């Protein structure tokens, strides 16, 4: 399986994402600069965290116009796994690949620490290796992680089981309905504020994020490997 880590000007979690795939999964991975217009050679697309284009205007607001976004939308339409983490989630929202928007944390501060999450849906290509309702610990690092959508959209997310992760116990940023991560209706585009790539080895303080990447590989192998 071949992963692409998309790098925008201002990305700063791309190396973490790369090593999570290369070192912990043992899968092929390449950095892809934001000006490419084709991602056909890749099986999964990863949008890492950071401050794309300095987060001017809004987080992700300029990155949505990058050349690579056309290729990302095409990959999403083809059903390939697309994962946006932190700033990557914000970019997916700005690009319309996921519903809703991000606001500043209700504390008006940057928050960087481990946080508890509950797995609300383990039937996606990103969460099959988790137990339903499993509580995991994943780091967060953001100043604009306060997810918001209108009431109609929230009810659709609930009805369609698109809410994948919710903050457990403490809501660190004021996010609506404790939402930490959602998928699109098709289930192949996941956006989440916590950083699973920073939780893939016990030496990093925990490995709860590794199952997310293992889930992607499991999905791909089940879909593409022919058993004889």
From Swiss-Prot:
Catalytic activity annotation: N(2)-formyl-N(1)-(5-phospho-beta-D-ribosyl)glycinamide + L-glutamine + ATP + H2O = 2-formamido-N(1)-(5-O-phospho-beta-D-ribosyl)acetamidine + L-glutamate + ADP + phosphate + H(+); L-glutamine + H2O = L-glutamate + NH4(+)
EC numbers, comma separated: 6.3.5.3, 3.5.1.2
GO CC, one annotated term: cytoplasm
GO terms, molecular function: ATP binding; glutaminase activity; phosphoribosylformylglycinamidine synthase activity
PROSITE patterns in UniProt: GATASE_TYPE_1
UniProt cross-references to CDD domains, sorted A to Z: GATase1_FGAR_AT (cd01740)
Species lineage: Bacteria, Bacillati, Bacillota, Bacilli, Bacillales
Chain's role: Part of the phosphoribosylformylglycinamidine synthase complex involved in the purines biosynthetic pathway. Catalyzes the ATP-dependent conversion of formylglycinamide ribonucleotide (FGAR) and glutamine to yield formylglycinamidine ribonucleotide (FGAM) and glutamate. The FGAM synthase complex is composed of three subunits. PurQ produces an ammonia molecule by converting glutamine to glutamate. PurL transfers the ammonia molecule to FGAR to form FGAM in an ATP-dependent manner.
Superkingdom per UniProt: Bacteria
Keyword entries, A-Z: ATP-binding, Cytoplasm, Glutamine amidotransferase, Hydrolase, Ligase, Nucleotide-binding, Purine biosynthesis
Compartment list: Cytoplasm
PANTHER family in alphabetical order: PHOSPHORIBOSYLFORMYLGLYCINAMIDINE SYNTHASE SUBUNIT PURQ
Positions annotated as active site in the UniProt record: 86, 195, 197
GO BP terms: 'de novo' IMP biosynthetic process
Annotated Pfam families: GATase_5
Annotated protein name in UniProt: Phosphoribosylformylglycinamidine synthase subunit PurQ
Annotated pathway: Purine metabolism; IMP biosynthesis via de novo pathway; 5-amino-1-(5-phospho-D-ribosyl)imidazole from N(2)-formyl-N(1)-(5-phospho-D-ribosyl)glycinamide: step 1/2
Ranges that cross the membrane: none
Glutamine amidotransferase type-1 domain residues: 3-226
Encoding gene, per UniProt annotation: purQ
Subunit (UniProt): Part of the FGAM synthase complex composed of 1 PurL, 1 PurQ and 2 PurS subunits.
Species of the source: Anoxybacillus flavithermus (strain DSM 21510 / WK1)
């Amino acid at each position: 399986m071949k992963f692409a880590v998309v790098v925008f000007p201002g990305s700063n979690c791309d190396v973490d994402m790369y090593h999570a795939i290369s070192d912990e999964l043992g899968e092929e991975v390449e950095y892809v600069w934001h000006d490419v217009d084709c991602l056909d050679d890749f099986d999964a697309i990863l949008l890492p965290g950071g401050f794309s284009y300095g987060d001017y205007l809004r987080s992700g607001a300029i990155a949505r116009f990058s050349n690579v976004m056309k290729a990302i939308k095409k990959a999403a339409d083809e059903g390939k796994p697309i994962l946006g983490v932190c700033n990557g989630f914000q970019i997916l929202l700005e690009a319309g690949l996921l519903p809703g928007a991000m606001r500043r944390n209700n504390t008006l501060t940057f928050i960087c620490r481990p946080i508890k999450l509950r797995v609300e849906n383990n039937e996606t290509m990103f969460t099959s290796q988790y137990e339903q309702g499993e509580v995991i610990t994943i780091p967060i690092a953001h100043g604009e992680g306060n997810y918001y959508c209108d009431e109609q959209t929230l009810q659709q997310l609930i009805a369609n089981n698109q809410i994948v992760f919710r903050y457990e116990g403490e809501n660190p940023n004021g996010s609506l309905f404790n939402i930490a991560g959602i998928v699109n209706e098709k289930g192949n585009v996941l956006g989440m504020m916590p950083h699973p790539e920073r939780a893939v080895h016990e030496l990093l303080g925990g490995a709860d994020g590794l199952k997310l990447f293992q889930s992607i590989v499991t999905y791909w192998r089940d879909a593409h490997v022919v058993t004889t």
